[in-house]
């Protein structure tokens, strides 16, 4: 089949070249128009349900809202995890779906089940779906800063809420624009309870009067002078004077009682659950990308829009960018594009040096851009964008892509040399040249195609990875496969034609190249010794494999190396119960300390949540975005690790457990596992006190484990409560029900939202409550006056007990089970070792209570899942490769020889990992898988040469004329005379990978871990090909000869 394709391609070479030209034009257009991003979309399919229950404590929100929602959502088809968050006034439910679920199908299913549960929620409470986005979609953040001093935080927040937000939401693929920080303007009706009692007016009557005085009505239309006039009755509240003139009732003598008579009306700030800080408090905005859309295009559109809006801003107000993901995208793409260009140049130089013939080198080099075009065309149809991983797949394939072309060119050189040697007086005419080139291609084409197919199939385990790891490495596996498949196709279709056109003139003999002479001079005596002592050679090889046991015990494990995104996120863990004022003070202190580090350019602090369903952060949760200066402006010798270490030593405040993480990586981890730290432990149970006790024990144990930099367990019961325990019997004596007292507590103490004003497009809430002096202590609450239905005036203490207690400040559930999370940050030690010691310490020192369970999460959970899948799929892939080898060689022994020799190629990779201080991870595992495919290819090519050499010696196939000397000569001929193509393949692969290994730009952390085992393996893989396979093949032939005899 392969022979037929080669011959038909040569016969129709004009059509093939036209097809290649069309492919190159199409591919170039695709490369220019391929969308780009920093990383693949790693987010799980997620649907968020947000429910507001204003003024309610977390336990009430959990019991009445979150629990009904989470238990119902467990039955949604395809849902794998349901997480619930109950906090003051809000419920968040995150439904995570299985891989491959269509996001809009998932939203429709959740909406369907939401309709079923709506009737179980409290009256007036409505659950709604969040945007079709996730926390990973926070692609651009900005702050509104007033330089003039004329605009307060309320003005800036109004500008953000009612102007900028709506303008930015018009941009295509912007799912939401969230506001954070500042203060929301609020009309506050502060009731004087004594005046209220004096006039005999209840709170319910005040609420009714406010509602009745804030309406508009239409009166249809009338005709006047042949024109239609629409009638309306204006009644919206718009000024404080409007509030003052609201009539509550008329006195006995007909004098009206106004709202101003019983209350003070003022404009003030709404209760704050989020604070933003940028050299002082500011108002921030977050642009959230719709799932699966092009981040770079949307950010460019946002910047253009903000630029046009600047002229519309009030005098002195500026928009300051605080986070811009497009900077990372540009750095990553520029870095890898540069590495690809470096690889192309280095590979071209290597080819020219070995072949010593410019036109022959061009044949090999031309396969690189053509293979790249093929890869990008397939990427376009699959919908893959250009990112660190997809470009990385092409980058690690560059060296292997030219392997087939190199072997074909070298074989063509040999056959042309032989023809000249056999016909010294003849001139090679055009027809004969094409015959020699075609025959040379057919000779090695099938084996090369099989070897490239093996390299392609070696990536099957990567395709089977699930979840986040699958989405991360899938694009790399796809693009590498497309590039190698393109190279295989070019090797049998285009390369023979290019050789026919370009390999002309005098072909320099291999011996004329000083580099080739040196290789043969070194290899020749070593191979003689190997063939003389084949068993000793194999024994030494086996012992060398055993040497990897030492570095394997020294090399740690991790899920992925930390990617330098250029920005940092400071997310300290704090204990609950902090006030808004204290949170703002803490934020300003930490931001000031962070700014003292010279490499920091800007600090944008946030504590609490943004106004979006994608952010469920409680008030005590700090997220500070740190923009670093360009690396060339850093102090000499500074690295990201050193900056983090200096930041950690600088920011030391009581009650804070520091955590420094890349922004995108953090949001991906929190979406996938819910844990913000690299290592997390989830304690689940039914009794909150038991969960808290176990979590605190684990926190104490974790701090004793080497490598743990910080450990903090969330306190489920760390919140502070003032409980109003209603005495039903006492309330009944005054004609009051429990609901009557609760309504009073909700409205007078908590503050009731009784409507909103309409001021153009702006809407501001109206809040009704008692003065601060009547509700600032338990004693004051006990003395709150209540007007009973029988118009008696009593105090709250007459119908209820007021007590101070503790309770949950925020409740988290996983699949409807209450859960506490312990955040653990590890430094100066690999993650796997830390987790293993943690597991051992917890098993020995922590006693599980009945009904509780402990599970490790965070990146360790992802690593465990990936390892489990690879342990299953790698052996299966080796079986598939074995079958291919058998089909190629038709001998079980020869297929076994190549498969069994692959571990020797891994020796160099493991030693280089140890030498460079890299940990085993999914990235290094990908490098080892790629190395195994290349090592198998080396074995195939060497075995092909050895078989050809033996087949060319008829005496070896006859038991009567067989001799070991003849066998050695044939093996020597097949190996030594073909040392150039083998050395070239090794050189181009190493040369192609070195720019990746030495790279320092964005994304190099992952790519260098993939390249390291491949480069290390390229040191031992040639030894496998050049020495071990000839030695083993000799023993195999000797055994075969003995069996024949």
Curated annotation (Swiss-Prot):
Q: What is its main location?
A: membrane
Q: Its induction, per UniProt?
A: Transcriptionally regulated by CusR in response to copper and silver ions.
Alphabetical list of InterPro entries matching this protein: AcrB_DN_DC_subdom, Acrflvin-R, CusA-like
Q: Where in the cell is it found?
A: Cell inner membrane
Keywords annotated in UniProt: Cell inner membrane, Cell membrane, Copper, Copper transport, Ion transport, Membrane, Transmembrane, Transmembrane helix, Transport
Q: Which domain of life is it from?
A: Bacteria
Which GO terms are recorded in the biological process aspect for this UniProt protein? copper ion transport
- Single Gene Ontology MF annotation: monoatomic cation transmembrane transporter activity
Q: Which Gene3D superfamilies match?
A: Multidrug efflux transporter AcrB pore domain, Multidrug efflux transporter AcrB pore domain like, Multidrug efflux transporter AcrB TolC docking domain, DN and DC subdomains, Multidrug efflux transporter AcrB transmembrane domain
Purpose: Part of a cation efflux system that mediates resistance to copper and silver.
What this protein is called in its record is Cation efflux system protein CusA
* Species annotation: Escherichia coli O157:H7
